[in-house]
Amino acid sequence: MRKSFYSWLMTQRNPKSNAPVAILADLVFDDTTFPKHTNDFELISRYLEDQASFSFNLGQFDEIWEDYLAHQYVDKKESYRLF
């Protein structure tokens, strides 16, 4: 089962980093209404565009989403190796 985007994003938090993923992670951490239990791209993208209490470049979000998907694929491959 895939980790929610929020769960994965929280592993990317780093207040000292200027990387877009770290910035988004810190913004989302402080946003109490962010959809935490989903991995639905459309739902999260619409939330960031229409409802988030902060502004974030959606082009950068698309890149971060691709990184999230890549990590999910790697994690899945690693779990198969355990068996």
From Swiss-Prot:
Q: Which InterPro entries match?
A: UPF0346, YozE_SAM-like, YozE_SAM-like_sf
- Tell me any Pfam family this protein matches: YozE_SAM_like
Q: Which Gene3D superfamilies match?
A: YozE SAM-like
Q: Which domain of life is it from?
A: Bacteria
Family recorded in the similarity comment:
Belongs to the UPF0346 family.
- Name the chain's protein: UPF0346 protein M28_Spy0369
